[in-house]
């Protein structure tokens, strides 16, 4: 299964925020500079992450964005469920003649659930804590 760029960059934004020293805020511009993503795309991602409670946005002169929960409380599987459209096949099409007997959707659904269950074993903290090579690449030591 390949994640959409929306989910990919959502996870990367969370990784960046989790890599920062505790309490440090960042900005959407800073995140887009680190990953070379369009600002408009990142604004949409951060808005969805904010609505889901993964990111807190603070307005004003000293505002910015930061994690909305501790990194140890953010399960990667939950983030993927929030950001990723998980329907792998469109079985509602009237043009598919095998829909009444097809078992593909069920098989793919089970595969997606296995994928998400495995991702549920990891938190954001698992990906960033004590990861010096990551900090060097993100320049956040």
Curated annotation (Swiss-Prot):
Cofactor binding note: Binds 1 [2Fe-2S] cluster per subunit.
Organism whose genome encodes this protein: Escherichia coli (strain K12)
Residue pairs linked by disulfide bridges in the UniProt entry: none
Assigned keywords, A-Z: 2Fe-2S, DNA-binding, Iron, Iron-sulfur, Metal-binding, Repressor, Transcription, Transcription regulation
A Pfam family of this chain: Rrf2
Protein name: HTH-type transcriptional repressor NsrR
DNA-binding region residue numbers: 28-51
Domain of life the protein comes from: Bacteria
Molecular function via GO: 2 iron, 2 sulfur cluster binding; DNA-binding transcription factor activity; double-stranded DNA binding; iron ion binding
